[in-house]
Amino acid sequence: MFAKTAAANLTKKGGLSLLSTTARRTKVTLPDLKWDFGALEPYISGQINELHYTKHHQTYVNGFNTAVDQFQELSDLLAKEPSPANARKMIAIQQNIKFHGGGFTNHCLFWENLAPESQGGGEPPTGALAKAIDEQFGSLDELIKLTNTKLAGVQGSGWAFIVKNLSNGGKLDVVQTYNQDTVTGPLVPLVAIDAWEHAYYLQYQNKKADYFKAIWNVVNWKEASRRFDAGKI
């Protein structure tokens, strides 16, 4: 689950609410990490985690908060002056909300999806999730192989998500997205893997396949199992 600082700002009636309907809203913030920056070494370096969290993720936090503020201001303006020009401005701001909001939520999922080996990182899933993986993919290794294929297929920047699809009886699937697009609606993200260069380049340089292979040593399958059982993040 999201850390308290993020959850308090986003959770409404048990779900994820990115836009407040009140005149005054609480801005989103970086989530608390449950481990130190260096705790995922040697698979992900402390330097990468520190920059990823304090610089890149913070940029999405700032960008999302700014975009939501601008959207609310434009909403008020459009109510007073319902012109095509103001409508176009709102459309443009929605694109920023989608990008920075996706970056914010994707990274919140990403940090929760990781854990050092001392906290169970890399340990295979158990229970209902393990059974579903075996039934659909034959083994965890086959699911990881499929996910890595999706990650390798990202041209430029993007993500791969292992999801539970609530629209087809809760079947598992692997979804590839570009830039900071996220999964929504009936797709419950169980595992989110960042394929942007900032997630690996300082350590793995152009050998991103090595990063895709290494990260599974610190994937938090306990968190994935919790989301699978709950049917929500």
Swiss-Prot record:
E.C. no: 1.15.1.1
Domain of life: Eukaryota
One cellular component (GO) term of this entry: mitochondrion
Keyword Metal-binding among UniProt keywords: yes
Cofactor note: Binds 1 Mn(2+) ion per subunit.
Keyword tags: Antioxidant, Manganese, Metal-binding, Mitochondrion, Oxidoreductase, Phosphoprotein, Transit peptide
Boundaries of the annotated transit peptide in chain numbering: 1-26
Tagged with keyword Chaperone: no
Subunit note: Homotetramer.
Comment field (misc): Present with 10900 molecules/cell in log phase SD medium.
Protein name: Superoxide dismutase [Mn], mitochondrial
Gene source species: Saccharomyces cerevisiae (strain ATCC 204508 / S288c) (Baker's yeast)
Gene it is expressed from: SOD2
